[in-house]
Curated annotation (Swiss-Prot):
Cofactor dependency: FAD
Pfam families the record matches: GIDA, GIDA_C_1st, SAM_GIDA_C
Subunit structure: Homodimer. Heterotetramer of two MnmE and two MnmG subunits.
Any single Gene Ontology cellular-component annotation: cytosol
Protein name: tRNA uridine 5-carboxymethylaminomethyl modification enzyme MnmG
An example Gene Ontology biological process: tRNA methylation
Organism expressing this protein natively: Rhodopseudomonas palustris (strain HaA2)
Amino acid sequence: MRNSYDVIVIGGGHAGCEAAAAAARLGAATALVTHRFATVGAMSCNPAIGGLGKGHLVREVDALDGLMGRVADAGGIQFRMLNRRKGPAVRGPRAQADRKLYAAAMQAAIRATANLRVIEGEADTLLNEAGRVTGIRLADGRELVAGAVVITTGTFLRGLIHLGEQCWPAGRIDEAPALGLSASFEALGLALGRLKTGTPPRLDGRTIDWGAVEMQPGDDPPEPFSVLTPAITTPQIECGITRTLPATHEVIRANVHRSPMYSGQIQSSGPRYCPSIEDKIVKFGDRDGHQIFLEPEGLDDPTVYPNGISTSLPEEVQRAILATIPGLERTVMLRPGYAIEYDHVDPRELEPTLQTKRLRGLYLAGQINGTTGYEEAAAQGLVAGLNAALAAGGGEGVVFDRADGYLGVMIDDLVTRGISEPYRMFTSRAEYRLTLRADNADQRLTDKGLALGCVGTERAAFHRGKMAALAEAKALAQSLAITPNEAARHGLSLNRDGQRRSAFDLLSYPEIEWPQVRAIWPELAAVSPSIAGHVEIDAKYAVYLERQVADVAAFRRDEGLLLTDVDYAQVPGLSNEARGRLERHRPRTVGQAGRLDGITPAALGILAAYLRREARKRPAVVDGEG
């Protein structure tokens, strides 16, 4: 067996698959080390991809030729655009997935990836020399050599499952934890913490009274995640919606002392935006009920995931809870819910490339960095995989910043501010969300992927064709003009100022949509619906986008002021508090320094002035010298 690679990726979850595929797409000889290939692409918690903020990440992964979007399209059994009635910036694509179809599609994608080999085994020890990673040792003693290593262990690092008063070591249900790597991290001096997440019981859908619950259909037609998916062909299903009742809350209150979160058995923090049902009852006791989404786990699988009642209460208490919920009174519980604690690395130990500051060539992605969610993991995996391949080949790393995409927002949040609870992506975290929309992820990122070399020929050809069609349609819309009097004859009420307005101008009005301008100018009928949608969104946002472009330019100026070699003791005027924070966190740029807690605008001004003075001191370079 070959034992030398450019990049080794540890873990076959959502982060690991994207990391391995991304590294391989850049031409790196890549090994994906996982316990069992059969678990690659497993959806450990909810059987769904996307959502608010999360759907943006899936589209961005797809724009860089990642796997998740296409795999979700292959496995999706209900697609919905969340926030459809709101503006395009906050709409979030989401898909309910068939677990088996999703995992099978991901495994097929991994098998089909050139330069990628899967090795079954448990990574036990990191090997390093002179401050650089050199490879890994497996639990069976095998050693693998590599120029870079990406670790994506999910909840497996010293994982501990809790169910009522019981607890036992596990990475997820029925799978062993990873124990050796945490010791390797501690030996390197990496700061570790503990986090907690949980999952609800699984139900037998054949025993649910579906007539007693509200049914929720998906969108028709379903909208794919990937621009390379022409249409969704998998059969689509409906989900159910029910609610807890006061009787449910009474059962929980009577037994909350048996929850590991409230008995003191679990000390670590769980995800604020995905609380357990016992947490909801304790913290929001004034509510009459809490919504539960009944999500089928597959087309030929009777298992149902009750989204909204994550719990680690004892098994018999979980049964008692279910018996009080409309539609679930007689349901059979196939598996109880549980909580899991696991180690994570303080993400402030990382560079924006996701390389650790303490050991060159070591990259971390996914829940190990304190995030929660498949989509957050996938986006980090892609970035880590790209950078690992670039580093192994002796190249410069790539940084995605807050103006590039949600993946840049997430990574900057992690490496700058750190986390005190599992980090989840929301649209509200992005300052530039008018430009960082789910619908334009490919327009923002695919050219960057082409420059990096991580985008394949199929996507490259599609992208060139789409961008040409978009430019042509926009130019056409801007070339067709009409007077207010002419518009009135078509039923459009405009200010009678005598000014001619283009079709693009008309689309900027909130009440005017593409079908109305197409009715005026028949030549617009040749524009495809998807391209027309992009033109209309650009028109609606045009004024606001101009302002945001100026904001992004100011942001980029601050991001261009590098602080990597600054000795803060030599910067006059900084307060001791600011100096201490800057020394401790070592921000890359003035922009990143400004996002640290306790760094004031005055301190930023001092830093910018210092950098300008230092730049003036450097000798000018004359062409031809040196």
